[in-house]
Amino acid sequence: MDAMAVTMTIIAYLLGSISSAVLICRVLRLPDPRGVGSNNPGATNVLRIGGKGAAAAVLLCDMLKGTIPVWSAYYLGIEPVLLGVIAIAACLGHMYPLFFHFQGGKGVATALGAIAPIGLDLTGMIMATWLLVAILFRYSSLAALVTVLLAPMYTWMIKPQYTLPVGMLCCLIVLRHHQNIRRLFTGEEPKIGEKKLQMPKSQ
């Protein structure tokens, strides 16, 4: 890995470490998403506690955390496998943010943002899959899992040279969802839009 790739990997992690959900909730004077609802600082939990506008803002910012470093690295001519490493770094920053006590989200939106520079056709297929599963079953985590399992196949169909880095990224997302997988099997996973909240954790 050359110096440019190393630099972009570090930048990707630091950018990913900016928790959009926590910052937007602070600005809007909403509860800390790490202490209410699903305790996950992501768009789905912010939807529960703050509504569609706040959730949309979080979704956009989280996607940009993946898009900006990967697109920049692509523009600089960094090879596909290393683009995957940079994408993973952005997602790791989101999952384990340096600036927020390593309490982060699941990385789905950031991963989507990281994949987006490959092409709008691939991005559209991924978003359509997530929306279809989410509408049918109303589980954000299930939609994410189905989508990331299919994403490498979609990539192989459209731009096969990026299949390995996308596959690496998708494996990380599946591992991060291990608790959601358990709750799906036990019937304890909250559905999209549920308003039932836990009391905020004491500081």
Swiss-Prot record:
GO terms for biological process: phospholipid biosynthetic process. It is a multi-pass membrane protein. Pathway: Lipid metabolism; phospholipid metabolism. Its EC number is 2.3.1.275. It comes from the Bacteria. GO terms for molecular function: acyl-phosphate glycerol-3-phosphate acyltransferase activity. It is found in: Cell inner membrane. One of its GO terms (cellular component) is plasma membrane. Its main location: membrane. The chain crosses the membrane at residues 4-24, 80-100, 117-137, 139-159. Pfam families: G3P_acyltransf. Coiled coil: none annotated. It catalyses: an acyl phosphate + sn-glycerol 3-phosphate = a 1-acyl-sn-glycero-3-phosphate + phosphate. Keywords: Cell inner membrane, Cell membrane, Lipid biosynthesis, Lipid metabolism, Membrane, Phospholipid biosynthesis, Phospholipid metabolism, Transferase, Transmembrane, Transmembrane helix. It is an enzyme of class 2 (transferase). InterPro entries: G3P_acylTferase_PlsY (IPR003811). Belongs to the PlsY family. Catalyzes the transfer of an acyl group from acyl-phosphate (acyl-PO(4)) to glycerol-3-phosphate (G3P) to form lysophosphatidic acid (LPA). This enzyme utilizes acyl-phosphate as fatty acyl donor, but not acyl-CoA or acyl-ACP. Probably interacts with PlsX. This is Glycerol-3-phosphate acyltransferase. It comes from Vibrio vulnificus (strain YJ016). The gene is plsY.
